């Protein structure tokens, strides 16, 4: 049985959590898609100052999404970045989704900033970079929900995933794998988040467009299998 730390960096809000899902359940369900065995999961809430005390006691750690920017002056972010470096040093398989992707990149010295093209929302197609074509045969179709993006590839990693709207959409290296999109998101949850975002920093026109691009099938199972292949390689 693999022991996994799910490090949350935000909450979905009371209404979405009560009617659809919580981040806890979304990440746990996603991890089980490709695990092939039972998981011993422990939840941590980084945005509330709760981090694993000993990362080496876990086989894997996944760092989730957040409305925060990794460059913003929140007190909880520097300890999170420090923990990421420790986890990688301890050879714990360390994975990041969206904000988690950006946090791992920032912890390793990469720049993270807002995209000049604005928001990247709903279904997107992600191609495997030439150096990573052996990871999967076909592109991934996954849900995006971000404006911040990793601007450079940190030393010791390589970019394995890219899209027209996000050049550095995934990083891979010794004991780490990251992904800018949200493979844990379902169309139903994404619709609820988009509707709840009206009147906020996301233009309503962007939300209307995104809502038309949530049909079809998504590659969440393949993404989970990719994660577990990196975990097993690190064990």
Map each language-model feature to its residues.
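Amide-donor transfer/coupling interface in amidating biosynthetic enzymes
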Residues: 2-8, 13-16, 89, 128-235
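Short, glycine/charged-enriched secondary-structure capping and boundary segments
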Residues: 19-22, 56-58, 75-78, 109-112, ...
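A generic structural signal for alpha->beta connector loops
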Residues: 38-40, 91, 109, 139, ...
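A short acidic, often aromatic-flanked loop/helix-cap motif at beta-alpha or helix-coil junctions
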Residues: 48-52, 120-121, 150-151, 167-168
């Amino acid at each position: 049985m693999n022991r996994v730390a799910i490090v949350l960096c935000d909450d979905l809000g009371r209404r979405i959590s009560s009617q659809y899902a919580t981040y806890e359940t979304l990440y746990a369900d996603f991890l089980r898609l490709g695990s092939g065995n039972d998981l011993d999961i422990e939840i941590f809430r980084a945005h509330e100052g709760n981090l694993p005390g000993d990362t080496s006691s876990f086989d894997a750690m996944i760092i989730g999404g957040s409305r925060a920017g990794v460059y913003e002056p929140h007190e909880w972010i520097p300890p999170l970045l420090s923990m990421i470096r420790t986890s990688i040093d301890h050879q714990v398989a360390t994975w990041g989704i969206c904000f988690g992707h950006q946090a791992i990149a920032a912890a390793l010295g990469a720049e993270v900033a807002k995209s000049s093209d604005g928001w990247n929302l709903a279904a997107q197609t992600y191609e495997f970079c030439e150096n990573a074509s052996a990871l999967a045969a076909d592109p991934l179709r996954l849900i995006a929900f971000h404006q911040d993006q990793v601007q450079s590839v940190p030393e010791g990693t390589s970019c394995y995933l890219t899209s027209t709207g996000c050049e550095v959409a995934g990083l891979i290296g010794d004991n780490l794998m990251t992904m800018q999109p949200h493979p844990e998101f379902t169309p139903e949850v994404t619709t609820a988040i988009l509707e709840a975002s009206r009147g906020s920093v996301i233009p309503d026109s962007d939300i209307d467009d995104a809502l038309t691009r949530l049909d079809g099938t998504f590659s969440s199972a393949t993404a989970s299998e990719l994660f577990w292949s990196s975990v097993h390689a690190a064990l």
